[in-house]
Design a protein with these regions (language model features):
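Anionic coordination/interaction segments
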Residues: 1-354
Length: 354
């Protein structure tokens, strides 16, 4: 193993063991119909059909790798003296020291495993075949010798769908961005978002399969101090609950407060977080209902693995050189498939602006 990771050929993965890689490392999810990429610290650029004209998350590839990019998750635990200790199992943006870190780069999925502050967090990120919803399947396990009270806060920052306009029209774009709330029974909530001129055509949606005790949709409020707070330490996360602000303009985000509750020593709690786009909230509900069930999520993940197993099985070689085998059997066909689907249109270098 080198200082950054190793190949796990038996499961067709590359395992990153140090998130501070010399360059950002991305993995493609889904397809051009709905998809994008996730980097080695959980930042994601997601779009539907055209990253120039229907981009969903705000991810600037030129930004320093230590900063927030598009999506993240926070965990928080109460301090004895009051307030909360806040950290991200993705390492970025809190840059919290870790006892273990793995980003397992698979075929159409990434699995993150981190251990810090007495908690082990596993996050599987993928898009089911043929679907327009991104799944983050989260499991938090208490490794400490006493019970811990844990909150989970997933966050996404939206961009204007016209990706170039987001960068060059600072006057008009913020006036168009709006967030909406659809409250369900038993505390379940769907936060949706769209520029007002598109809201009757489609909505981005963000939700979870656990009750949402509070939410935030205004970036300035989330960061705190009139926006002078930071993604590394958002001011609102020192409060018991988020503000329940519905942004009618400005920089739209979606953040959900999920109280995992007290986790006894050695036990786990799980959550499923969903990000997608549909023709209105009603159009999103069938996908939300299906993929809020962990049984259906596991079934969709197995279908994704079966798809890649069938694709790779068409041609396999066995030579005296395991590196050559790895390239021909796994990574070259994967690269060809990704290039065919994305046409070198969206990456860290091809920015997908049209």
């Amino acid at each position: 193993m080198n200082q950054y990771g190793y190949f796990a050929d038996e499961v067709c993965e590359y395992v990153i063991t140090n998130p501070q890689t010399p360059v950002k490392w991305i993995n493609y999810l889904g397809s051009l119909d709905f998809g994008g990429f996730v980097d080695q610290t959980g930042g994601m650029l997601i779009c539907r059909q055209d990253p120039a004209l229907n981009r969903i998350t705000r991810y600037l590839t030129q930004d320093p790798p230590s900063g927030f990019r598009g999506t993240t998750l926070y965990l928080r635990i109460p301090k004895e003296e009051g307030g909360y200790e806040v950290f991200s199992p993705f390492f970025v943006p809190t840059l919290t020291s870790f006892d273990r870190y793995e980003c397992r780069v698979g075929l159409g999925y990434s699995t993150f495993i981190s251990e810090m502050r007495g908690l082990r967090t596993e996050i599987r990120v993928f898009i089911p075949l043929g679907e327009q919803v991104l799944i983050q399947q989260v499991t938090v396990t208490n490794l400490s010798e006493s019970a811990q009270v844990v909150d989970l806060v997933p966050v996404v920052e939206y961009t204007h769908p016209d990706a170039l306009k987001q960068l060059i029209n600072a006057d008009w774009v913020p006036q168009t961005m709006q967030s909406y709330l659809d409250a369900e029974d038993a505390g379940f909530k769907i936060l949706s978002q769209a520029p007002f001129m598109f809201k009757e055509l489609w909505r981005n949606f963000f939700t979870a399969n656990l009750p949402v005790s509070s939410f935030e949709s205004d970036r300035q409020v989330f960061l705190g101090e009139n926006g002078y707070g930071s993604w590394a330490s958002p001011g609102v996360l020192q409060e018991r609950e988020l503000s329940n602000s519905l942004a009618l303009r400005g920089d739209n985000i979606a953040a959900l407060m999920l109280h995992l509750g007290e986790i006894p020593e050695g036990e786990s709690r799980a959550a499923i977080v969903l990000l997608g786009q549909a023709e209105g909230v009603e159009g999103a509900k069938p996908s939300i209902s299906e993929f809020s069930d962990p049984v259906h999520v596991d079934k969709a993940f197995e279908a994704l693995k079966a798809f890649w197993k069938a694709k790779l099985s068409v041609a396999q070689v066995a030579t005296p050189d395991p590196d050559l085998d790895r390239m021909i059997n796994i990574h070259n066909p994967r690269q060809c498939y990704i290039t065919m689907n994305w046409s070198r249109y969206l990456s860290l270098y091809q920015l997908g602006f049209g």
